[in-house]
Amino acid sequence: MKSIRSLYKKLLQYVPDKRIWAYSSMALSAAAVCSYMGAYWFLWQSIVSILVIPAYEKAMYDAIIVVALMILRGILNIASATCSHYLGFRLETNLRKNGLHKLLDASSSFFDHNSSGEIRKVIDDNAAETHKTVAHLIPDNITAVMTPVLMFVLMFAIDYRLGILLILTTVIGVLQYRKMSEIGRASCRERV
């Protein structure tokens, strides 16, 4: 976690005036996840209104809220991606500029061993890769962290037994994944 934080800290030094776009992207992504989990909550309420308490008007109202929350989630995701892409494009531009400025200070012997086209390609390719990483990973990381946490909260809010069941299945899944990884690594070592 520290390495990711320090990586973003270093990258954001190239766009100090655009940091707000990173935080906006994070906030919008978090709001999108909350909207998504809210849709699940109202879907649950709608199902209860249909099957347990025959209250069809409430079920219809809850279904409309589900649709509205899913539309809101889409809008928030687009806004989050827009903010992170704006930051990514600015970062890409500034990285290219910074790389070219550093080249001006390079000795002439450096250019004897490396062609200018190769150097330019390396700078452009790495700046583009950094843009992709920043533009997509900022909202994706927030979603990847918040979704399971809010899913646990939602399950316990619906029924504590569902929450316990979700915890048990998660633990079993993690244990199976670890065992599968150990077997995969052992078979790779045998082949080598």
Task: Identify the residue ranges that each predicted region occupies.
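Hydrophobic alpha-helical transmembrane segments of ABC transporter permease domains
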Residues: A31, S35, A39, D124-L168
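Transmembrane helix-loop-helix hairpins at lipid-water interfaces of multipass membrane proteins
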Residues: P16, A22-A79, F156-R161
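A short amphipathic helical element positioned immediately N-terminal to and/or at the very start
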Residues: S3-A22, E118-I119, I123
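Hydrophobic/aromatic residues in alpha-helical transmembrane segments
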Residues: A39-I47, I64, S80, S84, ...
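Cytoplasmic coupling helices
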Residues: T82-H101, I142-T143, L166-R191
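Residue-level signal for transmembrane alpha-helical positions in Major Facilitator Superfamily
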Residues: S35-F42, L76, S80, E92-R96, ...
